[in-house]
Amino acid sequence: GYTQGDETNDPYEPLQHIPGLAVGGWYDAGDFDIQANSVLNTTQDLAYIWTTFRPERDQTLIDQKTKFADIHVPDGVPDVVELVQHGTLNINAQVENIGFVAQVIGQPQMHNYHHLGDALTLSDGLLYDPSLKPYEVSEDGLRSGTPDDRFVFTGRMSAAGIMQDIVSLAAAYPALKEYYPEESERSLKN
């Protein structure tokens, strides 16, 4: 499990919504947590694979804007480069919104850990509002009383942890430069 003390190490209050984090990254095998070490190390390893071997395989269409992926549909970008981008989208979002990569973006309750099926169905996609009754949706349709938003555990803040953030983004910079120059520069900047 994870613990979070009173200090969040970021500009947000405990349980306050942190915008911009629902992008990129990978879930752990067996649950739907997004762990820092998994995302950082996977992104770094994929970047090194690209810069060392340049595998040109392109069998997956990935559209980050619409969050759509389709296998066996080439899109002109090598799959490994798209995977590097998928990692940096998550890393950069955390660095820009929190200041560093959190220990984990995890499930809010034990019920979610035995969930089977598509991760999309873990949440209603609305911001949690404790003033609403469970499953009640606000009139504007943007908030609900369902406490299904992920928790961001930001107690990981350390010099050693931030070094891994830097190393992963630095490794991604040359891998992304040709196909995703904006994300490449964003990684270098962060």
Over which residues does each language-model region extend?
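HEAT-repeat alpha-solenoid elements in large eukaryotic scaffold proteins
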Residues: 43-46
